[in-house]
Amino acid sequence: MTAEELRKSILQMAIQGKLVKQDPNDEPASVLLERIREEKTRLIKEGKIKGKMTDSVIYKGSDNSYYEKVGKNEPVKLEDLPFDIPDTWAWVRLKDSVEINPRSTLSDDTIVSFIEMKSLGGGFSNSFIYEKRTWKNVKNGFTHFRNGDVGFAKITPCFQNRKSAIFNELENGYGAGTTELHILRPYKNTILADYLLWFIKSPYFIEYGKQKFSGTAGQQRFGTDEVKNTLMPIPPQAEQKRLCLKIKKMLQCIEKDES
């Protein structure tokens, strides 16, 4: 197995709940998702975010099968789940767990970070470089993000090359960049940005995105609607922390062996 294959294997094991042991004392992911729904509802009512308060809820029935219920509609059995997950985990649509492609409102003279595609690290890194720009010059026609957001390339071949990062230490906490990015913003104290980053770099997510590409050859993209409907496995928050720590240590060991 090559180092690249090993890295991919680690991330796939991680999102399937096979990298660290489950702790029965952890608060289950279902409780975490309920907090997310409550926070999302509050933000929508306060006008701080746009969206509908009718999320889908995915649960395991008495027959051990998963069902999805959207609003007042009848539950629908999910036949296309990609793999099994531990009982303390939960499945969720990305649109129901994070904000996707949010926008920012700032004073025109605010200095922010500007990130081009070439400045975003690929592979299994978490890196980027930026230029300083005034908000007036980048507020229109570009993607918006802020500290703590996770961004990833949506266009081929940058998507397959895993160009993605957690944006932190931005100028005045905000940034803008290439329109060829999708932005994921976790709700406060819910899903870890580190877990989101490793999820979008996982073989499952990359292969799913490739299957959903649209557009002409050489200009294919993972569209917003397809991203929103992506199924994501969510561990309990405590397990997310253990997972991310384990991934970091294992990737460091691989990097050390390569040097």
Provide a role label for each language-model segment.
Residues N140-K201, F213, G223-T224:
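A short beta-sheet element
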Residues L81-D84, H182-P186, K228-I234:
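Short, well-ordered beta-strand elements within core beta-sheets of diverse protein domains
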